[in-house]
């Protein structure tokens, strides 16, 4: 959903993509929070934020685009190591597809968390997407 207007994002807007080699450094990855075994749980909770860079947003017709993924995992990774593996694997998946869009990023994250990084229990996604109005 567009955060400014409240309108739903159409399938065409979500699938609108650009070749990955046309945009250098298309994504910015950041770990927002890492809770080590909170409340005597047997899981770590890691919140990862993916931001689209200016050139990618311009190519896709977006004003702003952030995706937050809250990951519950039974692994006990170091924060920097989890981020490095996550970023590398997401970019590797997108490079194999050749196209980067909102949908392909969600598919790449799902692939990495459930097929590459073992120990993922569940993932919650939230996003902030604002389309260009003009």
Curated annotation (Swiss-Prot):
Keyword rRNA-binding attributed: no
Transmembrane domains' residue ranges: none
InterPro entries in the cross-refs: Gemini_AL3
Keyword annotations: Host-virus interaction
One biological process term in Gene Ontology: viral process
One Pfam family this sequence matches: Gemini_AL3
Keyword Lyase tagged: no
Highest taxon listed in the record's lineage: Viruses
Membership in a protein family: Belongs to the geminiviridae replication enhancer protein family.
Protein role: Increases viral DNA accumulation. Enhances infectivity and symptom expression.
Quaternary state and interactors: Homooligomer. Interacts with the replication-associated protein (REP). Interacts with host proliferating cell nuclear antigen (PCNA). Interacts with host retinoblastoma-related protein 1 (RBR1), and may thereby deregulate the host cell cycle. Oligomerization and interaction with PCNA are necessary for optimal replication enhancement.
Protein name (Swiss-Prot/TrEMBL): Replication enhancer protein
Species the sequence originates in: Indian cassava mosaic virus
């Amino acid at each position: 959903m567009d955060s400014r207007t409240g309108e739903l994002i159409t399938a065409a807007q979500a699938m609108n993509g650009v070749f990955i080699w046309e945009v250098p450094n298309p994504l910015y990855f950041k770990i927002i929070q890492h809770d080590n075994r909170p409340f005597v749980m047997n899981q770590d909770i890691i919140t990862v934020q993916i931001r689209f860079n200016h050139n990618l947003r311009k190519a896709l017709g977006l004003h702003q685009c952030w995706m937050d993924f809250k990951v519950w995992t039974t692994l006990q990774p170091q924060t920097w190591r989890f981020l490095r593996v996550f970023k590398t694997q997401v970019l590797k998946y997108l490079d194999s597809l050749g196209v980067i869009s909102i949908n392909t990023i969600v598919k790449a994250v799902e692939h990495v968390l459930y097929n590459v990084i073992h120990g993922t229990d569940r993932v919650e996604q939230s996003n902030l997407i604002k389309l260009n109005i003009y």
